[in-house]
Amino acid sequence: MGSRDFISSLPDEVLGKKILSLLPTKLVVSTSVLSKRWRNLFHFVDSFDLEDSTPIRNADSFSDFMKDTVALLSNCPIKRLTLNSHYEKSSVNRWIRSALKRGCLELNLQSQYDHYLDIGIFFRNNTLVKLTLSSYRTFLRGNVPPEGRVFFPALKTLSLGAVVAKPALYNWLISGCPVLEELFILDVGSGDDQPTWTRSVVSASIKRLTIVFHFPHNTYPYEDDVEIKTPNLEFLDYSALRSDGSDVDYLDSLAEARLDLRLWELTNTFDFGEVTNLVSAIRNVKTLHLSSSSLEAFYYRCYTMPVFDKLIHLSIESDKENGWQALPRLLLKSPNLQTLAIKGLLHKVTYRCGNACACTSKPKKRYLYKRYEDDSPTSEVEGRCCLSTCRVKVLEISGYGGSLREVKQMEHFLRKLKYLETVKIGVEEDNDSEHLRTELMTLDIASSKCNIQFI
């Protein structure tokens, strides 16, 4: 019995929209040689993905093919256009215009090459829902429209890589989207690279904001205040070296924040930048994730620690280069904390970790000074144990290796956290979890309800 060709038996619309639309366009083009029917299926494709992973013999021939195809399909709807390669500027602009005229919902420009775009291409577009500009550099040309002009009336998701534009045009790219819900900004450079982000995000509609801003070789990009005016923000992921100042409104709706506030390597005294305003603005969060360097930034450059009344879940990362100096004050300022998650127990040994740590070193008198400027007494950190008063019920440890220091730290947690109900431990792959479990079960545990789980 001969084998049945299930693919060819499918309806044309299913083949075009459900199968071919998921493939790189160059691969779709190659199917046109199979038969006349397969060539006609191109009319049903509503997603175009132009990239280099599927090479063709002649790039010029492909561009000519696309030119002819775009002309033929001028009346067909299109959902998504992705450009991830190097094509002539005129071809790129023509394909974008054609896609937008055909009701394009998603446009992605993402490649290792420069793209040059005239902002006028996007005028009068009422359909685009998702826009990604993440090429090596995207140069936007044009002028800001008259005040009050809406840019993308339907755009909900905007991703900006190295977008080079006049500050007013860059900011209008964000503020001109009245229903924008998710914004992603990536601006990373090295050497003498200049930043493209204007250090400003102003939007009343944004709910999710991710910013990665990293220029480690020069403090110049960080001398201006970072401005964030997003009253309806629910999620913030912010990764950057500390700026000299910040202008962040109180984020009343913020439920989750992920902070990676990096320390400057150019100085040894941590004397540049501050995070006080930013930390105060996020005091309403329920879930807070902090990198290891964020803990040090909280200690050195956050002068007034707010009370995190709504904080339920706190997770921190550890490494051997950074200490837990801010952890005691942070725990004492989180009266309703229920879950404490720690990725890696090994950290830099320093007496400033206080009673949150089992490996404190003996302080030198010349270093005994008050770091914070709030009205809390020094005894709040140096006297009252931040763990004994902490009402954490769940302790989650990942990357546990079972070293002597880690065992001591686990013993310290188990003896001090009196309200623990569950301890979840993720063990490194090379370790014997059963042996580590037996070892931990011999330790004193303050809470009679505590259940230790290895995951």
Swiss-Prot record:
<dbReference type="InterPro" id="IPR055294">
    <property type="entry name" value="FBL60-like"/>
</dbReference>
<dbReference type="InterPro" id="IPR053781">
    <property type="entry name" value="F-box_AtFBL13-like"/>
</dbReference>
<dbReference type="InterPro" id="IPR036047">
    <property type="entry name" value="F-box-like_dom_sf"/>
</dbReference>
<feature type="repeat" description="LRR 2">
    <location>
        <begin position="152"/>
        <end position="176"/>
    </location>
</feature>
<dbReference type="InterPro" id="IPR055411">
    <property type="entry name" value="LRR_FXL15/At3g58940/PEG3-like"/>
</dbReference>
<feature type="repeat" description="LRR 3">
    <location>
        <begin position="282"/>
        <end position="305"/>
    </location>
</feature>
<protein>
    <recommendedName>
        <fullName>F-box/LRR-repeat protein At5g35995</fullName>
    </recommendedName>
</protein>
<feature type="repeat" description="LRR 5">
    <location>
        <begin position="325"/>
        <end position="348"/>
    </location>
</feature>
<keyword id="KW-0677">Repeat</keyword>
<keyword id="KW-0433">Leucine-rich repeat</keyword>
<feature type="repeat" description="LRR 1">
    <location>
        <begin position="114"/>
        <end position="138"/>
    </location>
</feature>
<feature type="repeat" description="LRR 4">
    <location>
        <begin position="308"/>
        <end position="324"/>
    </location>
</feature>
<dbReference type="Pfam" id="PF24758">
    <property type="entry name" value="LRR_At5g56370"/>
</dbReference>
<feature type="domain" description="F-box">
    <location>
        <begin position="4"/>
        <end position="51"/>
    </location>
</feature>
<dbReference type="Pfam" id="PF00646">
    <property type="entry name" value="F-box"/>
</dbReference>
<dbReference type="InterPro" id="IPR001810">
    <property type="entry name" value="F-box_dom"/>
</dbReference>
<dbReference type="InterPro" id="IPR006566">
    <property type="entry name" value="FBD"/>
</dbReference>
